[in-house]
């Protein structure tokens, strides 16, 4: 009986030791995970490197963009608006892709430079430049259709919707970091900037409406650089690209440009 009791006690002790070892291992694992998460957050909050910021931004953007896209695709819908999207924006993008491929063919295959200026297939015949400059000509992102077949233009169209929004967030965050804003505030401000209701609504209906959201922070940052006697190239290039991209939004950018320049001037000097 005594031997049996000792054997039972030994079994209980060994079992207890086993449970304690498992609990301690779980505790150590959780502690290390907490420590790792803390290290990641401290690294994200540090001001030394912004690589972690943009990695996290890209991941969060991908999740939110995927969720938005799923709401359409899951219901059998496309991101191309049935009114202005198909007859104007999508057709202009596909036409511009064919136009660019035709120009490249004449240059590299026929070894001559010919820029078609008139097309009888546009309405009753129209000037190509005056017809397309409002939609695609001048926008650097609309050069991408040259690499995409016409039957795949819809896929590129949907990609460009999110790409413009993504670049708008990059542009806004660069502006915030230039003004020494902390990463956490910049991160939240960037998400609010690119996923506001108007941004999503406008980007789905008229994709190039997102372009001024890319250019404006760079133009304003260029003004700050000039006031600080830094090189003016950012202001010059951002203003030039925004002017070539779309005259309709350029005059709006100019209004904010003058207001911001005056505000910063009296604030600095």
Model-based region annotation:
Residues 166-179, 183-267:
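Membrane-embedded helix bundles of polyisoprenyl
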Residues 58-66, 159, 259-262, 266:
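Alpha-helical hydrophobic membrane-insertion segments
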Residues 49-54, 58, 77-80, 247-262:
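Alpha-helical transmembrane segments and their immediate interhelical/interface regions
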Residues 6-8, 12-72:
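Start-transfer (signal-anchor) and selected internal transmembrane alpha helices
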Residues 20, 27, 40, 44, ...:
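Short helical patches
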Residues 1-4:
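Hydrophobic alpha-helical signal peptides and transmembrane signal-/tail-anchor segments
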Residues 64-169, 191, 196-213:
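Membrane-interface coil-to-helix junctions
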